[in-house]
Amino acid sequence: MTLIAFELSGETPEIPTAEIVGVLESENIPFSFKCQLEQVFIIETPGIDAGLTDILASRLAMTRHIIEVSGVSPANLTDIISMAEKVDFSNLNSLTYIVRAKKIKRKSHISSEDIERGIGKVLYDRGYRADLVNPCIQYRAIVSDNTCIFGPVIASIDSSAFERRKPHNKPFFYPGVLMPKLAQALVNIARVKEGSVVLDPYCGTGGIMVEAGLIGASTLGCDVQRKVLIGAKINLDFYSVNYSLMFQDAGSMALRNNCVDCIVTDPPYGRSALIQARSLDTLMQDSLCEMYRVLRPKGRLVLVSERPVETWAQNAGFRMADLFTQRVHRSLTRRITVLDK
């Protein structure tokens, strides 16, 4: 069995781990939870090959690095060096290396530089060659909650693509939409994978559909505002994803029963929006019943709201799977409700 550590980005305490679990489950990667430290999530698995590593690296939005754990020690320099001396580095052979250390929220009294020098000396004394510019392997030591997790980095996540897909960088911009990093995380929590059919019944400018489509899902979107539907088409065409758009009310969708695998949506609840002569509460009740109807058995709905929706969801037939909160600013805290059929 292999220990795998995920170094998390730290935007929220719970969403990053939930998206990791969602991707592992969607890709049928066997694993068991080992432990969690601040901004570090550790699992045990029979092994992750290069193909699965590439999938994880391309999917995860709120992870920075994935590490194959070689050693664990208390977070003091003596124990860290002692741990490194027991690590088998024979897989390096003639490859070059670099050692990098990260202190989570800088709570430890030892410096990252001392950790890097201490572990680097262990490798140097064994005859291995460092390369600070273009190393073949990066070893990473993460210090969190008085514990040091050490091992080679098997994948790093490039977040620059999410920056490039921010709403103001897309061909069609409309305010008040989710950032792509969060949208991708919610898609992962919904257990979307390549080939899934994903519905966003309040699709707006198509931000969630873009993230699901880039995974390889077939996406469906509904909205009652023609302007934003046209904008969604512009954005979806720009990213060349597989999509269908429908001008229709989320409370009465022209879709057959049990026809979608996953639903990920950010309804206009509590915000100014064009709603066809009904209250937002009534719309939410009706749309949750419709989402339950069109979702396949064992499918998952991930819904963003500003008020509790649990009662309406349970009345529609859903089972609560999880609930997360994300503070946006002083007057807005998002509720992310995960519901299973």
Predicted segments with their positions:
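Long recognition/docking surfaces used for binding and targeting
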Residues: 93-104, 108-131
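Class I S-adenosyl-L-methionine-dependent methyltransferase catalytic core
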Residues: 1-62, 77-86, 104-115, 125, ...
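N-terminal, Lys/Arg- and Ser/Thr-rich interaction peptides
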Residues: 87-92
